[in-house]
């Protein structure tokens, strides 16, 4: 196992996978640490980033959005305004804080679909089911995982089909588990490739724990920004562990990652200011088939 520690450096942009350990911080949540190898890495107390095709000079960083929003960092929510979803095979239900009927949630078999912006607190379990988010593309949704176990043999466990941004919050003191299947059954116009898949911006935060198994391809994949500011993660994936097409930004959390390809990846190389990985904090143990 290779272990490297850094005390000071400049943060760089990453065009694709995290393959060379480089940087420290220019802001964000906190200074963190990182190291990587194709076998394993254990890291603490430094911020890192890298580029497959070279590293960006400090003068070039202006094109990159390296900041975290207040809501990215704040995992709190108003419990009195939330909708509570109890997951159960064939019997999932939703209610308000005062136990009234809840709008914005539909149930079909083992699938639960959220259709309105707001905060949704999920608990319970689904076997061969999925939680969908399909809201207005200019609105936001917060999913609070409060002791959730979801498995889906032929698709993702959480699938954001439409939203401006979705926040997945890990409730304090809870352990949550998501496991997808090795083969997806998809309609012609569908494209999920991960246990948690979002077509739009996605943030993971909170202080709870999340175990993610990506048997099909990836564990977490966003087609826009993927941001993580807290939580404890045990991740296993056939291909990539954490994949944000436009960017991957992490400023906190503990990560135990085993994957067949890249642990941390961003792949948009066609737009200026996109396709970078920025690490501003966190504790990482990584075993990756590719160069992380």
Model features per residue range: what roles?
Residues 2, 11-292:
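A composition-driven surface/loop motif
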